[in-house]
Amino acid sequence: MNKDTTTPQKKENIAQDIEGFLQELIGGNDLSVDKHRKPSGRKAILPALVLWSGVIIAVLRGFSSQLQIWRLVSWEGFWHYSQYPVTDQAVYNRLADERGQEAMQALFYRVRDGLKERLAPYAQQKLATFATGVYAIDGSTLDKVARHLPKLREVANGDSKLLPGKIVGVFDVRYQQWREMLHLANPNQNDKFVATRLLKAIPVGSLVLADLGFFSFPWFDTLTDNGYWWISRLRNKVTYEMIHTFYQNGDTFDGLIWLGKYRADRAAHAVRLVTFSIGKVHFRYITNVRNPLQLTVNNHHQRWWL
């Protein structure tokens, strides 16, 4: 593992640059995230934009407690925001309010869109030029939490109750940035549970690189029916029927197949099967990009299939 050789001063400079970028993106008055009012109808003393921007700054500056967030917004102030006369408990209550999720999400979307504008000159627009965009979808179970709290000490090590859930996201391959991220409270939840929700973040006509956690014939048909291109690894023991061979030489194959050997469990659309070997490793992929001229398999493009 490579050691981090960045000096403390350089780290501080990087953090300041990031904070300046964030202030430019979300520090203006044109972004409103105050969608919820008090029961009395009055606006909260501490605007949601200030509170949740403060949370982001707290993470960037390495704060370790909610008390430091309260001090930031009520004592010190930051950016062009003045101090807000609120109690520490008021800040704690706001941070625990589930409605704050929408405000934080709005801030993250602003940062995401701002980053995309800056990354535009470096975007890999030559990747799969036939597609509107190129996106990868994947899910990952979060690491277990430490058993510091009394209630958690009673939970056996290895119990799924120690897992804080999982995240499932959409990654923009051309721009090399996350476009959407969802949290699932159940760590054992199947990724396919949120598959259709993820599609809302992906423009029609895009190429979707699907992880095996999303593998299912109905999912592939849904993508095709809704105007998406897709690529997926072929799951072991999946049956299929050969339709046409474009090319075959040893372990290398390119052709059309029906997923599902029998009509009762067959996918609605024919797909393209591509297989090849690199060293001793054999790869098998399926895609609805059925024209070999659109998505070729050679040394230059093999990264698509890996």
Where are these regions (language model features)?
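Conserved beta-strand elements of the Class I
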Residues: 133-135
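Residues in the helix-turn-helix
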Residues: 90
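Active-site-adjacent helix/loop segment of glycosyltransferases
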Residues: 121
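Conserved mixed alpha/beta core segments that line enzyme active sites in large multi-domain catalysts
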Residues: 154-155
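Single, function-defining residue in the core of a domain
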Residues: 1-70, 84, 93, 98, ...
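Blade-loop segments of beta-propeller domains
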Residues: 75-80
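Phosphate-interacting basic helix/loop segments used at nucleotide- and nucleic-acid interfaces
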Residues: 117-118
